[in-house]
UniProtKB/Swiss-Prot annotation:
Subcellular location, record wording: Cytoplasm
Identification of the protein by name: Trigger factor
Ranges where the PPIase FKBP-type domain occurs: 165-250
Any one of the GO BP annotations: cell division
Lineage: Bacteria, Pseudomonadati, Campylobacterota, Epsilonproteobacteria, Campylobacterales
GO cellular component, one term: cytoplasm
Source species of the chain: Helicobacter pylori (strain ATCC 700392 / 26695) (Campylobacter pylori)
Length: 451
């Protein structure tokens, strides 16, 4: 074996090797013997099949196994020469050449190594942080909203006309070209006027109706309606209003606190205000982080933390971004890329910068998570997916299985870890007085659900 190994930088190495044809052929008998012990061929007892017959019937498999064995031997020798072990690798080596010549094979491969990351400039990367502390006006607004959310709906007299914020019970049926359409009919349907639960023009048409009244009205579906078969269509609806209920507003006092904080002993308005203040502060913090500071922090990490990246991982990320992009392309563009190898190569190359940044940030986040002992339990991943399923009307088990089949659970976990690491760095950079506010509010800022 003629082997040459070159370490390009701390995260990349390259090997080139020449191996004689005999190196491959000498492996055939041993591999054929292993196959002969397992296969069953008519007329022969298991383990008694002649090697010549095995070599003939399983020639392709024998050659493939021999080549794989030879490649593994080359890699083993390369690792030894580099002074590395499997734990030092990142991903699998990328075989860039395996070519058979008259007397030998030529093999070339790129090897990715776990990068060395120095985190001494992290503090320089974290932008200044200042979260808006909720004032009395904001707290009062939230209390009024809670009083509204927890208010009960009560029956009104039959003469009262429907108005915004009323709860209506209706039957309705929609028609297009005088024919009912799918999903356009419901009975005893509850609707809060002004909630945008239905199309705005539909809700407006119900304003002023009285219990027992029936009404017909035209309606044009928006051109970008989520149900494509209805988008832009002219329709008319028949509606019968059965019942109008109005909110019985709650006063903002200790009784409201007992309703909202039902699991609390001795709930008071003062305690509710503290909880609301805490939740508003955390909401302001999350909004500031998600809409502005996390992206700034990522840009700074990318710019200031410098280390060698394994090119094999960048190439894999480019492949992933390219494949994902194909799903959102028009059929004509996909066809164009399929017909032109040069165009496909150029399109894939356009993802290099994004892939490089993504790989780099992932390595940095992973290093920070290990240093600060920040992690995400598998149950937290499942809870996140359960919430996603609930919000999108999907079956949670089916969604989790879909993520599992597509090997996406690890990506979800990594995204959650990234979110926690970035928030941790930003929290540490809060002004001292706001860090104190945060520590004080965290225990008291339980999620207050709408009624």
């Amino acid at each position: 074996m003629n082997l040459e190994v070159k370490k390009i930088d701390t995260a990349n190495a390259r090997l080139s090797a020449k191996l004689s044809i005999e190196n491959l052929e000498k492996r055939y008998d041993k591999i054929a013997q292993k196959i002969a012990q397992k296969v069953k061929i008519d007329g022969f007892r298991r383990g008694k099949v002649p090697l010549s017959l095995v070599k003939t019937r399983y020639q392709a498999q024998i050659e493939q196994d021999a080549q794989e064995e030879m490649i593994q031997e080359v890699l083993k020798n390369a690792f030894k020469e580099l002074g590395i072990e499997n734990k030092d690798l990142i991903g699998s080596p990328n075989l860039t050449k395996f070519e058979k010549k008259d007397t030998h094979f030529e093999i070339e491969a790129d090897i990715g190594l776990k990068p060395t990351i120095v985190l001494d400039k992290i503090k320089e990367c974290v932008p200044s942080v200042g979260v808006e502390v909720p004032n009395e006006e904001k707290i009062d607004e939230r209390l009024k909203q809670l009083a509204k959310d927890y208010a009960k709906f009560v029956d009104t007299n039959t003469q009262r006309k429907a108005q915004n914020d009323d709860k209506l019970t209706i039957d309705f049926e929609g028609f297009i070209d005088n024919a009912p359409f799918e999903g356009g009919k419901a009975e005893n349907f509850n609707l809060i006027l002004g909630s945008k639960q239905m199309l705005e023009d539909f809700e407006k048409a119900l304003l002023g109706m009285q219990a027992g009244e029936e009404k017909e009205f035209p309606l044009t579906f928006p051109s970008k309606y989520h149900a494509e078969h209805l988008a832009g269509k002219e329709a008319f609806f028949k509606v019968k209003l059965h019942q109008i209920q109005a909110r019985e507003m709650l006063e903002i006092n200790d009784e409201l606190a007992k309703i909202v904080l039902a699991n609390e002993e001795n709930a008071t308005l003062k305690l509710l205000k503290e909880r609301v203040e805490g939740q508003l502060f955390l909401e302001n913090k999350a909004r500031l982080y998600n809409e502005e500071l996390k992206e700034k922090l990522i840009e700074n990490l990318d710019e200031k933390i410098v280390f060698d990246l394994p090119k094999t991982i960048i190439e894999q990320e480019m492949d992933l971004l390219f494949r994902n992009a194909l799903y959102s392309m028009q059929a004509e563009e996909v066809k164009s890329l399929q017909e032109s190898q040069e165009k496909a190569k150029e399109k894939r190359e356009s993802f290099r910068n994004d892939a490089t940044k993504s790989v780099k940030i992932t390595f940095i986040i992973d290093a920070l998570a290990k240093e600060e002992k920040i992690g995400v339990h598998d149950n937290e991943v499942f809870q996140t997916l359960y919430y996603e399923a609930m919000m999108t009307g999907q079956n949670p088990e089916n969604l989790i299985e879909q993520y599992r089949k597509n090997n996406m659970l690890a990506a979800v976990k990594m995204a959650m870890i990234e979110d926690r690491v970035l928030a941790y760095l930003l929290d540490k950079n809060l002004p001292k007085e706001q860090q104190e506010i945060l520590e004080k509010m965290r225990p008291n800022a339980q999620k207050i659900q709408a009624g």
